Each structure stands twice: as C-alpha cells, then as structure tokens.
Amino acid sequence: MSMLCYTLIIAFLIGIWAAPKSEDNVPLGSPATSDLSDTSCAQTHEGLKTSRNTDQRHPAPKKAEDQELGSAANIIVDPKLFQKRRFQSPRVLFSTQPPPLSRDEQSVEFLDNEDTLNRNIRAKRENHPVHNQGEHSVCDSVSDWVIKTTATDIRGNMVTVMVDINRNNEVYKQYFFETKCRNPNPNPVQSERRGIDSRLWNSYCTTTQTFVRALTMEGNQASWRFIRIDTACVCVIIRKTDNF
C-alpha cells in the first residue's frame, strides 16, 4: 500500500514538472521572450512610421506672425526699379527705421549712404505757423512720416501700397511725408483764420493732396504708380456779399 502511494506521488510530481510554463513565467532570454520582444518592436516601428507619414501629410500649422514675416520677406523688389531718378520723390523714402524729424520740427533731414538704398535727402517741410518773426500762416499744419497700406492712384482706383520691401536680402519700409491741417474745421462760423476779415469772408482750412510715385502691388509684381498723399493745408475763402 505504501509503495502504491509513493508511486502516485512521484507520478504527480513528474506531471507538474513536465507541464508547459506560462508566458508570464518565462525567464528572460528564452525563445518565447524573444518572440514577444520582436513582435512589440515591430509594432512600435510601424507606429512610428505611421505617425511620421501623418505629420508629413498634415504639417503643423504655422503661427500668424511667422506667416506675416514670411510673406513680407518673399516680396523681392528688383534693384533696377530704383535706378531711374525720375521715379524719386523727396516725399517718399525707403528706410530700415523711421526717418527722424529735426528737433525744432521745422525741417526734415535724412542722410544715408547708397549701399542701404536710402538716397541722400535733404528736404525741408514747414510744420509750424511761424516762419519768421512777424510772419504767420493762415492755417496751422502738421507734418510727419507715415506708412500707407492703401491709396488712390491717378485713375481714381484704390491700390495696395507696398509696406515692406525686400532688396538684397534686407527689408525696408516705404515712408511718406504728409502735411495736413492741424485742426480742420470746415464750418466758417465756428472758427476764423488768421488775417481773414470775417465781416466780408467766410473761411476754412482744408488739406490738399498731390501725386507722388510709390511702389505698389499689381498682382504679384511691384510697380511704380502715382498715388495721392496729403501735402499742404490751405485756406479757402468765400465772399459773403457781392457788393463789390
């Protein structure tokens, strides 16, 4: 009886030892572990390839600032456009920085060399009603360098004015020197002008315009056009009676 028990116990232990091991208990370096590692690596590699293909098909959107800088840098202007002196105007200036006004606000002076596109300019614009002692302007005016994005051309059409200009891999801005009335008031009753006899005349100040050549966009090409800019403040008088 005891021999039979020993035989059954030994057979039971042999059966347990010979049973197949689970994948969780497989030691490292065994064939089963290698198969699992190869399978997971292959799946990971396929996932990386899929994500790369997705990124190539759907690139990340660019920021608005990057798009604006890129569009400004892509507008390349042929340097030959600046070789003709008849296109130059003292009221139009291309510069990498805002042009300075003089300290007394009575003249405008900008000086630079030819290598930086800014031609030598020495222009004076009146900005104060007092020219000399005893001389006064009928209307007060103010002048300043401005940047324009749109303007009216000589044909009366609205055109796009170039702001940033790429020349020789350097970006310049197009500035316009404008003069306008300081306090325009078309109502002659509310405001009188210097030296105008209000008993005989109605008067008011108004800003006048003239045409200058500026670089504008025509499709994808840069071209010179005549555009309107403010250039002076004048006094308009109207006779009240026709007695004379």
Curated annotation (Swiss-Prot):
Gene3D superfamilies: Cystine-knot cytokines. Pfam families: NGF. Residues 1-18 form the signal peptide. It is found in: Secreted. Expressed by the venom gland. Residues 47-66 have a biased composition (Basic and acidic residues). Keywords: Cleavage on pair of basic residues, Disulfide bond, Growth factor, Lipid-binding, Metalloenzyme inhibitor, Metalloprotease inhibitor, Protease inhibitor, Secreted, Signal, Toxin. GO terms for biological process: cell surface receptor protein tyrosine kinase signaling pathway; modulation of chemical synaptic transmission; negative regulation of neuron apoptotic process; nerve development; nerve growth factor signaling pathway; neuron projection morphogenesis. Disulfide bonds join 139-205, 181-233. One of its GO terms (cellular component) is dendrite. Residues 47-69 are annotated as: Disordered. Residues 19-125 form a propeptide. Its main location: secreted. One of its GO terms (molecular function) is metalloendopeptidase inhibitor activity. The keyword Secreted applies. Homodimer; non-covalently linked. Nerve growth factor is important for the development and maintenance of the sympathetic and sensory nervous systems. It stimulates division and differentiation of sympathetic and embryonic sensory neurons as well as basal forebrain cholinergic neurons in the brain. Its relevance in the snake venom is not clear. However, it has been shown to inhibit metalloproteinase-dependent proteolysis of platelet glycoprotein Ib alpha, suggesting a metalloproteinase inhibition to prevent metalloprotease autodigestion and/or protection against prey proteases. Belongs to the NGF-beta family. This is Venom nerve growth factor 2. It comes from Notechis scutatus scutatus (Mainland tiger snake).
